[in-house]
A protein has these predicted regions:
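A domain-start/cap signature at the N-terminus of enzymes
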Residues: 6-47, 85, 116, 123, ...
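Short, proline-enriched alpha-helix->beta-strand connector loops that line the catalytic pocket
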Residues: 83-85, 181-186
Length: 247
């Protein structure tokens, strides 16, 4: 995986466009986006909707890329050249979460949509519906880690027919409504030694979806703690699988 720092990191950040979404309901949220390297007229391209972890919160509109070196992973896996993908990533303010739940809880019921999720959905919808963007609405993917792993489960349970595939990393969802997720391709990841968010959260969701008739994928990495995203970043199989999915 590409490790970026100093000048190389800033050069990569500068390839993303920064924006602010002003919600019709009040308030705003920062987000960044990037286009595929090669755009051809009258052709559509996939989009990755990325949800950062707690370390990416703030107001600089860069933390969502620097958190867990996601920006390095996107570069290493050649999202913009090999996969010719769009990426859009919102930034949660310092005192908010993607999902308003206790990360240490054994389970939870899906709460009211958070301010950050609501506004980032609005920004995403506007981006997709903008005529100048060539987004393939049948190839919109979602991925998130830790706090963003919770956000990924939350997003697909709110919009089960919207995404073509999902990769929740060390998060947790509402297993009581797992039946909503039987049709969407999901590959969840967790470290079996995670002391921040129990691997049982991912395991329980995987089992609940299977009991409801779905066929999700789940990887539990032995000996890995909370930073299981490192395994995701380097998994060629995961990225190949993700970009092969279509709604």
């Amino acid at each position: 995986m590409v490790l970026l720092n100093g000048c190389s990191q800033q050069k990569e950040i500068d390839k993303y466009s920064s924006a602010v979404w002003n919600s019709p309901g009040g308030g705003s949220i920062n987000y960044v986006y990037r286009y595929p390297d090669k755009l051809k007229k009258d052709k559509k391209y996939p989009l990755l909707f990325f949800l950062h972890g707690s370390g990416g919160r703030g107001s600089d509109n860069q933390g969502q890329l620097l958190d867990a070196n996601s920006i390095g992973a996107f570069k290493s896996q050649r999202l913009f050249s090999k996969h010719n993908s769009y990426v859009l990533a919102g930034q949660v303010p310092e005192d908010e979460r993607w999902v308003d739940v206790d990360w240490a809880s054994k389970d939870h019921q899906m709460p009211k949509i958070s301010n950050s999720m609501k506004k980032t959905f609005e920004a995403l919808d506007t981006f997709i519906n903008d005529d100048k963007n060539q987004v393939d609405i049948d190839r919109i993917y979602i991925m998130g880690l830790s706090m963003g792993g919770y956000g990924t489960w939350d997003a697909i349970q709110r919009r089960p027919d919207f995404f073509a595939a999902a990769v929740p990393i060390c998060g947790g969802g509402d297993k009581s409504i797992a039946n909503l997720l039987t049709e969407i391709p999901i590959w969840s990841w967790h470290g079996d030694q995670d002391q921040v968010i129990s691997a049982a959260r991912s395991r329980d969701m995987d089992n609940a979806i299977k009991k409801s008739g779905g066929s999700p994928k789940y990887t539990e990495v032995k000996g890995r703690g909370h930073d299981v995203w490192l395994d995701v970043w380097e998994s060629e199989d995961l990225w190949k699988w993700l970009y092969s999915q279509s709604r």
